[in-house]
Amino acid sequence: MTIWIDADACPKMIKDILFRAAIRTNTNLILVANSYLTYPNSPFIRSVLVEKGYDRADHYITSHMKAKDLVITADIPLAAEVIVKQGLAMSPRGELFTANNIKQRLTLRDINEQLRSAGERTGGPSALSAKEKTNFANALDRWLAKSK
């Protein structure tokens, strides 16, 4: 199994947790981004640099991932595509996207997008809290334990 990171928007503290986990468990980790990233020197960690452009990283991930791979993303449409491809999608806050909750998340995303298009301020996500960081680490550990 492989962990994929939609890396351009993934917080550094979450990437650091993922790096340590990949090295500790000998799990392949692939960062996909449209800008250069630094990461630890490890045979289990690599990056893919995609062209700048709308959804290029998303397309690369969905084209190369396999069923049961884990994708770390806050991008709801990408999470939906991962689920269709039988992968597991998790947000950097530790929230698992599932077939049961992804439609609601897509609907909420679309409503917020319509509000923004109409000039409404919907605000962005709050800063990552210590509790969310812990939730992410715990959810990752559960996935790693199940996948080995």
Curated annotation (Swiss-Prot):
Domain of life: Bacteria
Pfam families found in the cross-reference section: DUF188
InterPro entries assigned to the protein according to its UniProt record, in alphabetical order: UPF0178
Family: Belongs to the UPF0178 family.
Protein name, as recorded: UPF0178 protein lpg0089
Organism whose genome encodes this protein: Legionella pneumophila subsp. pneumophila (strain Philadelphia 1 / ATCC 33152 / DSM 7513)
